[in-house]
């Protein structure tokens, strides 16, 4: 009996040792399983923003030219200042124009007097014709002279009106409200009516236009995707945002105004025009900007962070996923385009897949890994294209 007890004790001790070793091996194996960050894919929609180059264009431009000739005797604005519609910009010497008006008024008075005498003569001839004291020829001559005199009155009145207008044109005014540019003439300069060179340019900059260029390929792609339902366009006006040359986002949001129906043969692009509020004058004509045009919402999209997509030697896109057994699997995928810092995946992955986005250097296909949630799980749904 004692002999059996002596044999049983060592066997129990060995069993306990083996159990402890198994537990320690399991702990070591768990400790050696690499941790990876994963993103669980779910379909959603994203706002597609087309990034288009463009330049700012004044909302209105008025090149000021004189409508009468004469000597500039005064400039009534400060270059670079705001001018209102109707403000006086230049004063042309009115004396010659006033003399022309006075002469026209004198000619009108003379024409009126001649017409009055012709009317009296005609009336007298008409009365005498009834009693046959004058001939029909004398009557006809009197009527013709009256008609000519009345026509001369009409011409003289028109001359007075034109001279009055010319005198008003001596005060050169701004037809729009805007910012004045550099004056091309000084006091004492001789100007002529409708000359080729403008005196000054006035530009309205609030609001302001931005002319954008879009390639025909992108234009056709957008139309196809809208027609197929892949993109749901924004109802009403299309919002547009601007990035300035210094990299900063312009504070005001604009809207798309129109799309040019023709294609520029030299560049193969179409022109889009957006309009922006410019209350502080931050946008100046000719500035280069980058516009973000909201094309609409792309439906049922799988977005994969760029960290989760690599390209093999053949240039094909691949991704590592963690299957239901926590085994790393390699998938060949189709990443149609990058939107911001994410790829739009059209095949090779499906909703619910866990894509590995961090810890990639510690794993390879076929091994087990332990998943941890990635901070990129909730990716932005507004992206550039």
Curated annotation (Swiss-Prot):
One of its GO terms (biological process) is xenobiotic transport. Belongs to the membrane fusion protein (MFP) (TC 8.A.1) family. It is a lipid-anchor. One of its GO terms (molecular function) is identical protein binding. The gene is mdtE. PROSITE patterns: PROKAR_LIPOPROTEIN. This is Multidrug resistance protein MdtE. PANTHER family: ACRA/E-RELATED COMPONENT OF DRUG EFFLUX TRANSPORTER (PTHR30158), MULTIDRUG EFFLUX PUMP SUBUNIT ACRA-RELATED (PTHR30158:SF3). Part of the tripartite efflux system MdtEF-TolC, which confers resistance to compounds such as rhodamine 6G, erythromycin, doxorubicin, ethidium bromide, TPP, SDS, deoxycholate, crystal violet and benzalkonium. GO terms for cellular component: plasma membrane. Keywords: Antibiotic resistance, Cell inner membrane, Cell membrane, Lipoprotein, Membrane, Palmitate, Signal, Transport. It comes from Escherichia coli (strain K12). Induction: Induced by EvgA, probably via YdeO.
